[in-house]
């Protein structure tokens, strides 16, 4: 049976891809993906045939991968981070209903919440909620409700897609909601370009975060009541006795 692999390639660096992801890509004939992600792979897998689409062409990209697999090519659909967390795995299964002759295998990768947490120190040390601020596929009213629920329950909150040209005020809006439930001095963190050239990180308070500008390459972390700064790193204790 023909097969297409849906591969999470991690946050960016080749060294942070899983061994299974690398070995699977090595045996593939065709690699399909968003243009930015494909450019990250070409250096390490130069002999592959690459097919790309731009942003907002996700369904077409999936069908492209299935068409190649249906022809007999060993095919991979690549996603940044993990294929199942804001990735293409779900859409691949949905569109895969049109291609019953093609099997699907998902290869996990390290999502930004984990890669960014490590850069910050130990930001995600306890229960965590992952929320995307992009309203391209989810209405803002629902995003706002999820933010309120997560803040009220005192989760560590990791915000994906915190800003873009059209959503430059969304992080500030999210922080306003957080401040209804969390203290102004709640420890927060920002990591930009996780595991890529130009990686930066900073810790700051929730009050400061509300006034901070970030971009689409940033991942934002908002701590819980126990989160603190140790050695200039953001640390959320698990609760062990010391």
Give the location of each predicted region.
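Short gly/ser/thr-rich secondary-structure transition/capping motifs
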Residues: 10-16, 137-140, 202-204
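Short, well-ordered secondary-structure micro-motifs
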Residues: 44, 88-89, 116-118, 141-143, ...
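A polyampholytic, Gly/Pro-enriched intrinsically disordered region
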Residues: 73-79, 123-133, 207-216
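Class I SAM-dependent methyltransferase SAM-binding "motif I" and its flanking Rossmann-like core
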Residues: 85-153
């Amino acid at each position: 049976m023909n097969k297409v692999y849906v591969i999470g390639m991690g946050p960016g660096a080749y060294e942070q891809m899983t061994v299974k992801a690398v070995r699977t890509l090595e045996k593939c004939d065709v690699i399909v993906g968003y243009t930015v992600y494909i450019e990250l792979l070409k250096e390490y897998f130069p002999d592959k045939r690459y097919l790309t689409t731009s942003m907002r062409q996700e369904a077409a990209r999936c069908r492209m991968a299935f068409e190649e697999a249906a022809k007999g090519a060993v095919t991979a659909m690549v996603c940044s981070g993990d294929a199942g967390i804001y990735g293409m795995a779900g859409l691949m299964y949905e569109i895969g209903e049109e291609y019953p002759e093609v099997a699907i295998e998902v290869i996990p990768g390290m999502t930004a919440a984990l890669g960014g947490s490590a850069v910050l120190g130990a930001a995600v040390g306890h229960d965590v909620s992952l929320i995307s601020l992009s309203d391209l596929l989810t209405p803002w009213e629902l995003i706002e409700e999820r933010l309120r629920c997560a803040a009220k329950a005192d989760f560590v909150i990791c915000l994906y897609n915190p800003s873009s040209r059209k959503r430059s005020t969304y992080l500030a809006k999210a922080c306003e909601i957080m401040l209804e439930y969390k203290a102004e001095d709640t420890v927060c963190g920002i990591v930009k370009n996780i595991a890529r050239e130009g990686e930066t990180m900073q810790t700051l308070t929730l009050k400061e975060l509300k006034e901070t500008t970030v971009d689409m390459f940033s991942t934002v972390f908002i701590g819980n009541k126990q989160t603190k700064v140790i050695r200039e790193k953001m640390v959320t204790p698990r609760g062990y006795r010391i």
